[in-house]
Regions:
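N-terminal accessory segments
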Residues: 1-94
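Walker A/P-loop
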Residues: 93-113
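Walker A/P-loop NTP-binding motif
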Residues: 110-122
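Conserved nucleotide-state-sensing and coupling region of NTP-binding domains
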Residues: 130-187
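Conserved RecA-like ASCE ATPase "motif II neighborhood" in helicase/translocase motors
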Residues: 169-231
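ASCE P-loop NTPase helicase motor core
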Residues: 216-292
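ATPase catalytic-site recognition across NTP-hydrolyzing enzymes
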Residues: 283-349
Length: 349
């Protein structure tokens, strides 16, 4: 068996250019680190596989470096989101809404990692993923697909994709599973989430369905809400197909407010994660069809590594953005001046 080149072999023949030497050293360190990681996974595959298949959080921590190139800085909200998503995988939750501030890795967690873990659990799983942003839809779908192709994922779950369906908008596994990724306002036809087989077989994921610029539009906002009835529900293979909606709040009558108030008829488990946790906060009376999840997080900043109390005080200077996107309690247009230019657009994470 041919041995790997030594560091001295790698540097042999180089000029004395310091930049060239440093570049080669960095490449060598990266190569060795990757080889060591691959060896760790191969030698501990059974333990890693069992741990990851039992916990969305463990799966995310294990796979995140192979997606982002660095480890995940876990915050309290990650554990809360993962616990809720684990209930979806276990078949214990059929309707889930998660409200969380922008920039808190919601798309990576409930999008990329949820999709990849779903295919790890069942290569025949079928997902529909939708968001207001076509760019985000393609990026999330592509990231999930690319993560599944990594040597690290393949060493644990050797899932194969059909070569004739490897586009970012739609792709399939050789086993018959697949993903359709489409904008919330676009066409979603020819594909249904989940199969009729027992166990976890996929889900419908709706990630930020409403564009921030359209939050105050009495035309666009109701149109997106109506698509719950006209488009999304018709793409479910049966009524018990799991649905995960993860979004920042933008308006009292955005899709979260619309569904939690009973407009869709379904009851929803609701994980509400404001940027500042206040255990004395009362669940909104108008959410007649919401079942609040007790996340058990301690009072204070939701993710101190991202927003300290001082940072949050600065966010509060704009009450419209803060109340909606950060506090998850948007102000009613009739209660204050509400202008769409107050809202900040986030296309990722």
């Amino acid at each position: 068996m041919k041995s790997s080149p030594s560091l001295s072999d790698s540097l042999a023949g180089l000029s004395q250019n310091p930049q060239e030497i440093l570049h080669r050293l960095r490449m060598e360190r990266e190569r060795r680190a990757k080889a060591a990681e691959q060896k760790r996974i191969e030698e501990n595959a059974a333990e890693i596989r069992a741990r990851c298949e039992a916990s969305h959080l463990e799966f995310s921590k294990e796979m995140f470096p192979h997606l982002e190139g660095a480890g995940l800085r876990v915050g309290p909200h990650h554990a809360a989101m993962s616990t809720a998503l684990d209930r979806v995988f276990a078949g214990q939750c059929k309707r889930l809404i998660i409200n969380v501030p922008p920039g808190y890795t919601k798309t990576v967690f409930a999008g990329v990692m949820f999709l990849a873990m779903g295919f790890a659990l069942n290569p025949r799983a079928r997902f529909i993923y939708s968001s207001f942003s076509e760019a985000l839809v393609k990026e999330t779908s592509g990231n999930a697909r690319d993560l599944m192709k990594t040597p690290e994922f393949q060493a644990l779950w050797p899932r194969q994709l059909r070569k004739d369906t490897e586009g970012k908008g739609r792709w399939k596994t050789l086993e018959g599973g697949g993903l359709l990724a489409a904008p919330a306002g676009g066409t979603i036809t020819g594909f249904r989430a989940v199969t009729m087989e027992p166990g976890f077989t996929g889900a419908l994921i709706i990630d930020d369905p409403l564009k921030p610029d359209d939050a105050d539009s009495d035309t666009e906002r109701p149109k997106i809400n109506k698509r719950w009835h006209t488009t999304f529900k018709s793409r479910l293979a049966h009524e018990d197909v799991p649905v995960v909606i993860i979004m920042q709040r933008l308006h009292p009558d955005d899709m979260s407010g619309y569904l939690l108030s009973g407009e869709g008829g379904d009851e929803w488990e609701h994980l509400m994660l404001p940027v500042m946790i206040d255990p004395d906060e009362i669940y909104p009376d108008e959410f007649t069809h919401g079942r609040p999840i007790d996340h058990g997080l301690k009072p204070g900043p939701l993710w101190p590594a991202k927003h300290t109390e001082k940072h949050i005080e600065l966010l509060q200077h704009d009450e419209f953005v803060y109340s909606a996107q950060y506090a998850q309690r948007p102000i009613a247009p009739g209660g204050a001046i509400f202008r769409e230019e107050h809202l900040v657009g986030w296309d990722e994470l």
